[in-house]
Amino acid sequence: MSKSVNASLSSAINSVTLVKQENLKENLQNGSAVSVGSSESSNHSMKEISLDYSSPSLQQTEEQDRELNFIDSSMLRPTPPQESDNRLAVEKPNIQPLQGHSPVPSFMSTASTNISSSKINNNQTEFEQLRDSYKSHGDLNSAINDSRIQSIIFELNQQCEKESIPVSNIDWLQWASVPLFAYDLPPDPSNPNATSSSPPPLTPILELIKQNNFCIPSPCRKLVWQSLVSAERNELLTLYATLSTTNNSLDSSIRKIIRMQSFRGPLEPFKYSSTTRHKVSTESIFHVLHAFTLFDTTVEYNIEPLLWLTCAFLSYMAQGNAFRSLVCFIQRGGIREFFISQSSSLDESLFALVWGCLGDLAPSVAISLQRIKVSSLCILYPSLACCFADSLQLPEALRLMDLIAIYGLEMFVRLLVAIFLKDRDKIVNMVSHEQWVKYLRSDVLASYRQPLVQKYTFYTRTPVDLNAWVEDSLALNIDTTQFPSYLSYHETSVSHNTYRQNNLEELKNQNDYLTSQITNLEEGMVMLNKENTKLSEALSNHRVTRSEMEEATEILKNNSADLKAQLEKQPQELENRLLQEISILKQRNQKFLKNNATSIQQIQYLDEELGKTLKQLNDLKEKHAQLQTKWKSVSEMFRN
């Protein structure tokens, strides 16, 4: 691939050199006039206008954000909703993003905005000035020797060289000539006065990106990004001005997250400016996220993953353009669910696409993932949200962002498939899901890191060979038309697995119920065994008692038989003895009767004697009473 790029580059340089030698004299004579006329013919160039609308939330001091207080007025143009949505499908059928990520309905209402040629902003970048100057010439032959254009190209080369960006493959005039927006297209010959509303084709942009080693030059990113994501809709700028003055309940949490997370880790390079990038301020990040969270309230966004993308756009463009570019980038790229707090659909779709591609390219890897029950790549979401900036340098992460702007979710699929194919042996030998999680949480890009140059690299890791990674990813034979079938198959398998899991849960519940019943029965059996033991002991005791009672009964029966025999043998003797005893008793009774008669006589005599004694007693009592009275009278007489 690099050989073909070098060959095309050398041929382009030779052709440009020949044109320069032929038209040098002619263009030098007209150079000054052309450079003056270029500023007058830039009606439809990318101009910058202020967007504070006297809004306190949009006003910034120059110390805070000197480079970000402008907005591209050329983006304030209406765009038919269906044409820009079908743009990728018409121009690049082989790299078409996934369907189902069309812009939200708020995109549909447009209003035309006319920008007069007198409102030319002096804050244009060198690339925008180069585009304006090139448009004033109209063709390559007349523009190639313009002193103004040459000075701008020289400045662009210097800017790129200061950032260690190779400029040998960059043809600035081709980048300036490529149509990026609808107004860059030539007028229709049949109706010259009609303005073009259809978006320009993407094929020239893609060819230039391929020639530049699949990378957009840093000075061109501002315009090319907006062109790739179709962010030329002026109603988003108006909406941004409205949302910036609207109260947001998430402002406190957004400020807290920005204060805690900004300019740390992958965000640290955005703290400083460069020759092609602006310095990003925390206030500009807050304004963009404030408007973005108000723009889409259908889901709850996670603020931390949005920080890197927001800083990337703010480092190249103003707040309004960064807002609409962020909206279009997330909506059209199909990566919206990377930034949602509770994400499930992308978790399934991303893994479904990766697993489907692995099933076509390396069935052993797909079978291994299925064997260890892998169903999610959510561990990689923070790295995917920042274009692997946590493992790459900022220029390399921005290169990946260029490819994501072109391919969308498909590029993430290609990058992950390339990594998994590179680590095929490691994945095939995995035996548990814990090993897979450990692999994702470790250095996933280890297979693409360059060999060690120093003996010890304790504090830093070796750089990643991004060219090899991107070339391997784009060289994969992936058919994007199979993506819907991958998703449907995965949805079917997930539904089957869900059904099986539900059945398994029901069986587990039934098993638990049966286990509890068995436990209860076992406890009942233990109790019954105890009762059975008690009853068996009682039965044995009863049997012993019964045997003893039977023995006693036999003895009693024998005694009774003996008694009966004895009674049968001695009845007469008993009768005689009874008669004798009766006669004796009769005699004794007669004696008692005689004794009773004598006793009665004695009792009568005693009764008579008792009567006499009682009579004497009464007489004595009377005598005693008389004596007492006499005694009292005598005693009283002696007292007196």
Swiss-Prot record:
Protein origin, superkingdom: Eukaryota
Parts forming coiled coils: 500-636
Localization: Nucleus; Cytoplasm
Keyword set, alphabetical order: Coiled coil, Cytoplasm, GTPase activation, Nucleus
GO cellular component term, pick one: cytosol
Entry keyword annotation includes Nucleus: yes
One Pfam assignment: RabGap-TBC_2
Sequence ranges of Low complexity compositional bias: 109-120
Gene Ontology terms, MF aspect: GTPase activator activity
A single BP term in Gene Ontology: signaling
Region (Disordered): 96-120
PROSITE patterns: TBC_RABGAP
Family indicated by similarity: Belongs to the GYP5 family.
Protein name: Putative GTPase-activating protein C1620.12c
